């Protein structure tokens, strides 16, 4: 029995990046031997065990043979005769197919993953890459993480991804897995690389057709020097990742705030009147299809519907601003206003030449919300008001607080 550290922990150590969970592969053992040493079996589709002390996952070396369509259609062989090289061959990318001997620290790199790390190239291990459609998503997600480190996608890997998209292999992706990879990509430093990688492979139209439809739609060059709405969206996503690192909630709202521009009649281009209202329907459809969690849906719909109002905050009447806060449920969910401000700032700065622009509307929105939030129903009830009187007085007092905060700049 030999034990090796594999996958992301080895890769990240070589990149001198923070490592996440450690994964181990065991060569030359079977389930009975693992259990005899105290390992607890937990795998359903293939033999995976938890270490009796560390709780880390240890998997028996295995091969996988394609037996059907999609990412579940595999026959697994975890016989003790399976070699380390055979186990590494089934992995997706060369940089993830490096193993380190637990005892000696020696690296095993049969597919030149170290060379690709040094060259900053994301490359598939072998032809079996095309057998699992999830690997297209993983390639895009890894690019979102690694592009800031200078990585590019190998041309032959990009070609395989295009073949998979053209062949309909991506149709078998389940919504939960698409959402899982999208959410992780939105937590990375450069989400635009996720979008661009999928778009270039003609896979975005299958995975996120509502976002793919933005590419090629022109905007007014005086407001958007980048012109193409798809490019604008890439820039917004990257700015959002800078403003709120690792925050997929803000990232998803930023990603979907402009979906309505894809529905603007071509005769109206490059203007997009009412796009903030048109965008709600495709956003809801996307959320239903991918089974997006409610907190993500709600913030995204708010950002889609309200971002233009926040941009023109100074023009809004006090009562109109209060109505915006109510639509955001900002008195019960006050955190939404800071999140909305981040999305709107990303939208404003996600334009060529505006990447470092100031966005005073964000701080103003938070300040005015805080003033209104300081007024509460308990204080009014203490004054003897009851029932509907409290609601009416609360609205009036909050609007007055917004007006006072505007006048004093407090």
Swiss-Prot record:
Sites where the protein binds ATP: 8, 11, 91, 138, 141
Other comment: A single active site specifically recognizes both ATP and CTP and is responsible for their addition.
Record lineage: Bacteria, Pseudomonadati, Pseudomonadota, Gammaproteobacteria, Lysobacterales
Membrane-spanning parts: none
GO BP annotations listed: RNA repair; tRNA 3'-terminal CCA addition
Name of this protein: Multifunctional CCA protein
Cofactor note: Magnesium is required for nucleotidyltransferase activity.
Positions of Mg(2+) binding: 21, 23
UniProt cross-references to Pfam families, sorted A to Z: HD, PolyA_pol, PolyA_pol_RNAbd
EC number, as in UniProt: 2.7.7.72, 3.1.3.-, 3.1.4.-
Protein source organism: Xanthomonas axonopodis pv. citri (strain 306)
Catalytic activity line of the entry: a tRNA precursor + 2 CTP + ATP = a tRNA with a 3' CCA end + 3 diphosphate; a tRNA with a 3' CCA end + 2 CTP + ATP = a tRNA with a 3' CCACCA end + 3 diphosphate
Domain notes: Comprises two domains: an N-terminal domain containing the nucleotidyltransferase activity and a C-terminal HD domain associated with both phosphodiesterase and phosphatase activities.
Keyword Nucleotidyltransferase: yes
Domain HD: 229-347
This protein's encoding gene: cca
